[in-house]
């Protein structure tokens, strides 16, 4: 059907909290589109016949189709189109890097800004959660049982896809709350816990059983899951083992991995005065790294009362791997970027005259060396090179290392015949099948730390393979 295309080169702006106000609270920064803004943005879509945007989506959402429904005001219909392929639309609409995926393929981006696909997805999911039909029922059981290890994006996606086909699915989560990295790793101001809980509840209504406080490799093993009657197992245990630089001073009090810092804040409320697992608040904080996790840690530290927060990154602003939107939000909130420098030592306080001085063993600063960009590395980014003799010190009280994570070796060490690569990632084929029969894996447990949507894509791929495998038994 013909319609009048909105040819504005600019997308509809996303309303946000004022930067000065939001720097002191954990409320969501982006406020979401109104119905009017969503429909107006939907009219920017050209409804391309070859649908290049879909090719950029790891879970292959029918993007032009759901946008057409938004354009016509059928928001519930749009939700049904999205959830035909995605189990976590309200999550993806908020945290997926659409600018490097579906939106990067949008034809409107050739002469202006791409259609705000992620913003429209979020609008549709939020509208459904507020006004839509929440009646979801489990399909007829098909008699097969599947165990999912981990309730992060790959595990939840795999569970949802299998549950829709009638499988009896049990998800085993090591922590006390379902959601994986979505709840322990991403702060409330970017992804509210209530949003994740709503998505998880939808899966429960589909018949998915979620058991928390079960550590596979400790509480149960993969082999014991098969002994319990499960016919296939999907490992979506993520990459929760933090990386460090191996420089002097990393054992000082006041040095955290971003993984620990965010988990304590997001999930354990360690910022409370009576917390059993407190984290340091206030003072000057240096966050080492340039990805989304670094931005999350820096902005969390600011909200916890830090006097000053620095991002320390060895490349320039152009090479920052974090989403541009997150970088802009951090800058607006007053976080200072110390670029083209890299830590070589974390400096600690030591009072030789008073070994009982309570400051002994705590961070007092960080020593960095200036960098310059050399030749491109294997990923095409210019390699940072140290400038000899350029060391300088920064006075800080807390250092947060946000330089990536690796898969935990626990499952590998308790599962005979499970092959992993040099970085600890589980080795899989194109269907997510591991070196063990009927054991599949996906997400960060395979790739190391990556995006939510790529993990979801891996969960979807594995679910399809598991269905084909069990259908043939």
What is the predicted role of each segment?
Residues 22-40, 61-94, 111-140, 265-266:
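Ferredoxin-type iron-sulfur electron-transfer modules in oxidoreductases and energy-metabolism complexes
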Residues 47-72, 91-124, 170, 177, ...:
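Iron-sulfur cluster-binding cysteine motifs and their immediate structural context
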Residues 77, 140, 145-149, 197-247, ...:
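Feature captures the FAD/FMN-dependent oxidoreductase FAD-binding
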Residues 124-140, 198-218, 242-304, 420-435:
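Glycine-rich dinucleotide-binding loop and its adjacent helix/turn
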Residues 144-170, 294-302:
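N-terminal Rossmann-like FAD-binding beta1-loop-alpha1 element of flavoenzymes
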Residues 171, 175-211, 298-345:
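Rossmann-like dinucleotide-binding cores of NAD(P)H-dependent redox enzymes
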Residues 251-282, 376-449:
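FAD-site-proximal beta/loop scaffold in flavoenzymes
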Residues 297, 445-473:
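A conserved FAD-binding loop/helix module that cradles the flavin
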């Amino acid at each position: 059907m013909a319609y009048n295309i909105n040819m504005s080169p600019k997308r509809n702006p996303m309303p946000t909290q004022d930067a000065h106000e939001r720097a002191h609270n954990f409320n969501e920064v982006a406020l979401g589109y109104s119905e009017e803004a969503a429909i107006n943005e939907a009219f920017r879509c050209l409804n391309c016949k070859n649908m290049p945007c879909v090719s950029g989506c790891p879970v292959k959402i029918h993007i032009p189709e759901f946008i057409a429904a938004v354009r016509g005001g059928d928001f519930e219909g749009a939700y049904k189109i999205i959830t035909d392929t995605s189990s976590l639309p309200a999550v993806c609409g908020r945290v997926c890097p659409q600018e490097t995926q579906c939106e990067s393929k949008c034809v409107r981006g050739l002469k202006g800004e791409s259609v705000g696909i992620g913003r429209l997805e979020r609008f549709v999911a939020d509208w459904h959660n507020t006004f839509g039909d929440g009646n979801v029922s489990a399909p007829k059981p098909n008699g097969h049982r599947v165990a999912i290890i981990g309730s992060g994006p790959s595990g939840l996606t795999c569970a949802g896809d299998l549950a829709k086909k009638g499988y009896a699915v049990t998800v085993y989560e090591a922590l006390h709350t379902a959601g994986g990295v979505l709840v322990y790793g991403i702060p409330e101001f970017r992804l509210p816990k209530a949003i994740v809980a709503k998505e998880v509840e939808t899966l429960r209504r589909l018949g998915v059983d979620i058991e928390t406080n079960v550590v596979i490799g400790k509480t149960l093993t993969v082999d014991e899951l098969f002994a319990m009657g499960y016919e296939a197992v999907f490992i979506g245990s993520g990459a929760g083992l933090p990386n460090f630089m191996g420089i002097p001073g990393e054992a000082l009090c006041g040095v955290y991995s971003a993984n620990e810092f965010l988990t304590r804040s997001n999930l354990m409320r360690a910022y409370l005065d009576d917390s059993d697992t407190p984290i340091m608040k206030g003072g000057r904080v240096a966050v080492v790294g340039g990805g989304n996790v670094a931005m999350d840690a820096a902005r969390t530290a600011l909200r916890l009362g830090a006097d000053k927060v620095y991002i320390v990154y060895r490349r320039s602003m152009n090479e920052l791997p974090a989403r541009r939107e997150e970088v802009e939000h951090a800058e607006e909130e007053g976080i200072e970027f110390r670029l083209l420098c890299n830590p070589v030592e974390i400096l600690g306080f030591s009072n030789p005259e008073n070994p009982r001085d309570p400051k002994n063993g705590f961070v007092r600063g960080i020593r960095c060396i200036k960098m310059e960009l050399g030749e491109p590395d294997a990923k095409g980014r210019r390699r940072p090179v140290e400038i000899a003799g350029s060391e300088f010190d920064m006075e800080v009280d807390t250092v947060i290392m946000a330089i990536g994570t690796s898969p935990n070796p626990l499952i590998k060490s308790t599962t005979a015949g499970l092959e992993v690569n040099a970085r600890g990632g589980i080795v899989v084929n194109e269907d997510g099948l591991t070196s063990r029969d009927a054991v599949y894996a996906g997400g960060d447990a395979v790739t190391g730390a990556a995006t939510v949507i790529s993990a979801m894509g891996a969960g979807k791929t594995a679910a399809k393979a598991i269905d084909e495998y069990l259908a043939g038994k």
